[in-house]
Amino acid sequence: MIRSSRWFRKLLPALLLAVLAVGAGRSAPAGAAARHAIVISIDGLMPASYTEPEAHGLKIPTLCQLVAEGAWSPGVRGVMPAVTYPSHTSMVTGVSPARHGIISNAVFDPEGKRDGEWWWYTAEIRVPTLWMLAHDRGLRTALIAWPVTMGAQADALTPEFWRGRGIDGPQLLRALSTPGLWDAVGRRFPGFDAAFSTLPPKDEAFADIAVDVVERERPNLLLLHLSAVDHWQHQNGPWSPEALAAIETADAQVARVMEAARHAGIWPDTLFLVVSDHGFARQEKVVRPSVLLRERGLITLDAQNRVASWQAQAITFGGGAYIYLHDPKDESTAARVRELFSPLAAQPASGIARMLSHDEIAGLGGDPQAFLALEAADGFGLTAGVTGEAIAPAPNPGIHGFPPDRPTMNASLVVTGPGVRPGRIEGARLVDIGPTVARWLGITMKDVEGKPLEAVGAPNPSARPQ
């Protein structure tokens, strides 16, 4: 025992130096360690949900309270295209998809070899994210079902990920999450992981994780993504009974996370945001751009109707599509593609409202590698597939993915916290959310397109009641 004590006394200085060295790499900015930010994204939530809930028969007391007491936007301008993964990445980077690199939900897969792979991995993001900057400054971070967080460095992580098109069950996400996280949540909420055997996983289960993490770890930054509203609006349409029920369920989960912040004692120091990534529209028919390309001889199929070769190919995202050239310098193919799609925009029955040039895509912050983009006409959507009819009945009524200048694609924003000036926010953009949160946490996002919202002023923790 004495010899052990002498050994420990000799080792103690080295241990202290090691601890100090580790701490030096993650030093929190002065005054920021006591601050917290919680961002809850309700995927596909339309601003009319909280600006006129009575018109839709919605009972959302929590969102209504936040609107009454905080600041809110009648419509946040999104990104090109208005889909989940580019939008969420623009929120946390402050830049457009052209710069952060997450240019759609699914990875462009012209020959169908990647089984519907999405942009899952944090390593694919080309610029710093809000959670990277926070972690590097010594702040505690939690990421729960936030898109593009596979492999993210965070203190608590459950990424959004699935294999193929079926139900994975809880084992996969448990294995991909921070070790011990799901065990801790299971002790607080026994059986919560059963919700991951449904499609989509229930929002309540992700909120269970958030509640446990907030109360147990008190993170400085928590990002939570709830996806059921988006799912049911796709399946049954905007404002359908199923979609309305999902909005009300999401409202209840927001209330749970707020209560957890109060219980943890961090609410007076918390900037609290409820956001969405895009709006929604309805479709009755779908157009398959790749079928049109195949009919023009620009895509060749093998005996199994798989793509054997292609000169031009589309990736679709509901309200829009990108068209890529196999050889970007192939002027002959470029001319044939323009000749195919340009006249269709003048034909209402074609289902295509607009063809966007490469320069127009760049002006909207879209993929710089795309040759051109298509925008669906009202009542139409653009969908994948190289076989079948070029125009067909829509398999489901709800879509998004249009360019961001279409008002129905506007996203949502409600914010409360110390220094927040209550009332209406005009001119908000998704790229403003990250810089707004960063300023509150005392960190800097350099060389970004967004700017902190004026409604969220200088931090003043004493401004919020307990």
Model feature map: region roles:
Residues 96-237, 336:
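His/Asp/Glu-rich, glycine-adjacent segments
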Residues 28-71:
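Active-site-proximal N-terminal segment of extracellular/periplasmic enzymes that hydrolyze or transfer
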Residues 1-8:
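N-terminal secretory signal peptides that target proteins for export/translocation
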Residues 72-95, 144-154, 227, 449-454:
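Short, solvent-exposed turn/loop segments enriched in Gly/Ser/Thr/Pro and often Arg
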Residues 260, 264-270, 276-326:
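Acidic/histidine-rich catalytic neighborhood
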Residues 49-50, 200-224, 229-272, 336-344, ...:
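A long, amphipathic alpha-helix that forms part
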Residues 110, 126-127, 308-436, 440:
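Active-site neighborhoods of enzymes that stabilize oxyanions during catalysis
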Residues 11-23:
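Bacterial N-terminal signal peptides
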